[in-house]
Amino acid sequence: MNSFRFTKMHGLGNSYIYVNQFEEQLPEERLAEIAVKVSSIHTGIGSDGMILICPSEKAPVKMRIFNNDGSEGKNCGNGLRCVAKYAYEHKLTEETSFFIETLSGLVKADITEDNGIVREVAVDMGEPRLTKKELPMLGNEDERTIDETFVFGETELSGTAVSMGNPHIVFPVADINQAPLTTLGPVIEKDPRFPEGVNVEFVETVSADELHFRVWERGSGITQACGTGACAAAVASVLNGVSERNRDITVHLAGGDLVINWQDNGHVLMTGPAETVCSGVYYL
């Protein structure tokens, strides 16, 4: 294979290169290598990673995520919205409500479309996993990490750990513009307490229904948005008594806004946009 077709899409600036594996069938042994190449802003297309849209025996499509360092991720909220948009607009499904298979399980997407163009996607992200075993995180397997003190060098932070199919640690800050994202993000991501690494979020509370958010993503670094991270931030806000269940929480990310609702049934609903940037042919 010397080339393949791609579509670049983004959810609030969190951009990926999307490849339709129904048609292209990139070789398994080269996926990590290709993800690194296409993600490069200098020698590739430029993105936070690569997402494959694959056939599934359980749903209309399956999503596989590769970070820009070549590692494979389990879940991506912004990616899910873009996959839902792609699947509907490219006739991989004719339904406006359908499931997407991920490494974390089946996820339901509901789209809002106008003349065949998807304008907004609501994704049922399922129930948050909160125990150390589910994250995973070292320590007592059945314990939760809520408002726990963490010390990184000379910096002390209070963190809440949440998995949305991938691990997150959420730290409240007084001023989001002063969050130590570049200095502590890469340190916390690889903290040995998180054996699979962790996504790092800093959150400033505006009100019970409004949060400012910045993220250092595992395997990708600073990104404009992280859907699962926004979900984790909203869940952490509820767990710490700041927000309430079954209420819309607007999360302001660097790339735009998501609306998160931790419903009474235990599931987290994420609603936001998905955009197509361009499409073309990439030469290996």
Curated annotation (Swiss-Prot):
The record marks 168, 217 as: Could be important to modulate the pK values of the two catalytic cysteine residues. Substrate binds at residues 14, 67, 77-78, 166, 199, 217-218, 227-228. Keywords: Amino-acid biosynthesis, Cytoplasm, Isomerase, Lysine biosynthesis. One of its GO terms (cellular component) is cytosol. GO terms for biological process: lysine biosynthetic process via diaminopimelate. InterPro entries: DAP_epimerase_AS, DAP_epimerase_DapF. Belongs to the diaminopimelate epimerase family. Catalyzes the stereoinversion of LL-2,6-diaminopimelate (L,L-DAP) to meso-diaminopimelate (meso-DAP), a precursor of L-lysine and an essential component of the bacterial peptidoglycan. PANTHER family: DIAMINOPIMELATE EPIMERASE, DIAMINOPIMELATE EPIMERASE, CHLOROPLASTIC. This is Diaminopimelate epimerase. It comes from Bacillus velezensis (strain DSM 23117 / BGSC 10A6 / LMG 26770 / FZB42). The gene is dapF.
